[in-house]
Amino acid sequence: MALWQQGQKLYLPPTPVSKVLCSETYVQRKSIFYHAETERLLTVGHPYYQVTVGDKTVPKVSANQFRVFKIQLPDPNQFALPDRTVHNPSKERLVWAVIGVQVSRGQPLGGTVTGHPTFNALLDAENVNRKVTAQTTDDRKQTGLDAKQQQILLLGCTPAEGEYWTTARPCVTDRLENGACPPLELKNKHIEDGDMMEIGFGAADFKTLNASKSDLPLDIQNEICLYPDYLKMAEDAAGNSMFFFARKEQVYVRHIWTRGGSEKEAPSKDFYLKNGRGEETLKIPSVHFGSPSGSLVSTDNQIFNRPYWLFRAQGMNNGIAWNNLLFLTVGDNTRGTNLSISVAADGNALSEYDTGKFNLYHRHMEEYKLAFILELCSVEITAQTLSHLQGLMPSVLQNWEIGVQPPASSILEDTYRYIESPATKCASNVIPPKEDPYAGLKFWSIDLKEKLSLDLDQFPLGRRFLAQQGAGCSTVRKRAVATRNSSKPAKRKKIKA
């Protein structure tokens, strides 16, 4: 007989995880496809910062910024369908599913150059041709560099998540002195249009971590540099923030420099020997950093200007655009050419070169075009499906105007005619206006409500989709008309030998 020994641990089975259904289990595809595309989308601005001109503002348009497109699709439940038999409004609701997407970019390729006129680069740490034993009160230098090369394409029906490091609140027992290094924590935020990408200096909140105003290039000086939180979005139970993504990052260290300043965490004497003069402390900081470089820009490694077909998403949402919304997050600094514009200060043509007689301006331009292939789908209104959507995304049921019917009241209620008049009482039970959950966020809004078409063969992406299905552009071939002679040919007579 087996006996339970004293002190032996009892391992219980883990708590079962609440399952999230894949969208394919309750979404029926109708095999009706639409094409949607935008016009040529253009934006122009200053590549480093925002400029105020009179009562107007020149926006900041940098190649190192994210472009986040909020795409509004038409409501398919109010759509004029070619076949009324495909939809039963009393038993199902229609939704859109993304089948294909193409982000086209114009403008020539060019490296993204950034910099700072007073950059904190004390010494060149990779070339040991001279020895500097002390630093002055101001050793900042004019510095320029090409940023880390990045291409990002990310599609979902909710905004993408970004991560960054920032200062954290210290513990009560850890009272920080003035000038001490603050604790750090990793935070998340939605990636908005105009947020800065990580360009080789780390994903961090440089508004709080850059007191010298000289440690970074101008375009990220007072910004939060974000890096897409692929780990968090991949673990999202709903799978709404990232259907799929494509990315390419490229960087190498061009120069190695030393920062200037008072190093409070200098290496101790256990790491080096003192010199003959008895000096035991280092006078040059040991804070080294690398100058990033994106290197060669080529058409061989472009992720744009090509179609992407979504057969199976990485999450549980297989491309369903809930609430008729899509969020397309794009980052691309391979077309980072900035225009240097010189204008005569007095408006007259210059006859000789004089730096005081012309004004300099800086501009960056971007060009986009978006195209989508959408499939019409339906969701059957059942108790299981509604319960699942209520726990997953309640706003879907609110937009479908599906809710619990309250019981009929037996109390006689009052209805005022002029309820907004000062002569009557204040209105009660007023339905609040519908709020946009993304009202406080900044996106490039694109309205495609009137830009859907069933004629796929009339658009480049539509023709590529038809080719994937084995159906190309077919033309009516004219058959050759066979001419017949009314007179029958005479039969040959056989002659016996």
UniProtKB/Swiss-Prot annotation:
It is found in: Virion; Host nucleus. Its main location: virion. SUPFAM superfamilies: Group I dsDNA viruses. GO terms for biological process: endocytosis involved in viral entry into host cell; virion attachment to host cell. InterPro entries: Capsid_L1_Papillomavir, Capsid_L1_sf_Papillomavir, dsDNA_vir_gr_I_capsid. GO terms for cellular component: host cell nucleus; T=7 icosahedral viral capsid. Belongs to the papillomaviridae L1 protein family. HAMAP family: PPV_L1. Self-assembles into homopentamers. The capsid has an icosahedral symmetry and consists of 72 capsomers, with each capsomer being a pentamer of L1. Interacts with the minor capsid protein L2; this interaction is necessary for viral genome encapsidation. Interacts with protein E2; this interaction enhances E2-dependent replication and transcription activation. This is Major capsid protein L1. It comes from Bos taurus papillomavirus 2 (Bovine papillomavirus 2).
